[in-house]
Amino acid sequence: MTRERGFVLLAVLLVLTLLAVVVTELALSARLEASMVRSYRDGVLARHLAEAAVHQAMREIMSPSQVTALDETGQLVFHRALPGQTTPIRLPPLPRRRVALGPGEFSYRIADESARLAINGAGAARLDRLLAALRVDRTQRDIIDDSLQDWRDANELHRLHGAESDFYLQLPTPYRARNANLQDPAELLQIRGVTRELYGGAEDRPGLGELVTAAAVSAVNINTATPLVLEALGLSDAEIADVVQTRVRAPY
């Protein structure tokens, strides 16, 4: 009788253990499914919010404006010239920060690509002035100036301070010079002389990557260009100060 009772007790304990395992597995499965549902829901909401932000930004960009400038806060705004008025009027911007939509909200920022220096067509003198404004020393500027021209030209002949494929193929991760225009500003990081610190910037200065564009920009928009870009254009400190103060009141 004692043996039978012991066997029954072991059987009961085994069943209880199996039940505990099954219940635990079911609970984990339910939590996983709930987490997947939440992730899917949040993903759908995030996509709709992102699309809404893009469409609202496009509404502003496609507005009937002739002048793009910065307001007192540094926000990009659009102006429209009316017949009989010498000063363009500012179009009221749509809300861009924490715009409520359903259970979520979105924010966006509009930047002017023509506020940057066109790296493929700016010319060596403007690039050199921009590097000087970023406090790059003469030796490093010579290397970057020549290496950028070598990167863009169609041959493999390097300039005095430049570099072509023979230099880049000796690096730990070898690659060839493009021998064509840059397709993205980040490509500057592949060019001899351009460091990550120079490209990314620091707390007290912006990076080179924020000041240039690979887009085919015909002219720099002085209404939105930063003082550093204005300096690269050859403006003096007094001229830059005058432009920055005047363009807020009356864009050029």
Where are these regions (language model features)?
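Compositionally biased linear targeting/interaction segments
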Residues: T2-Y252
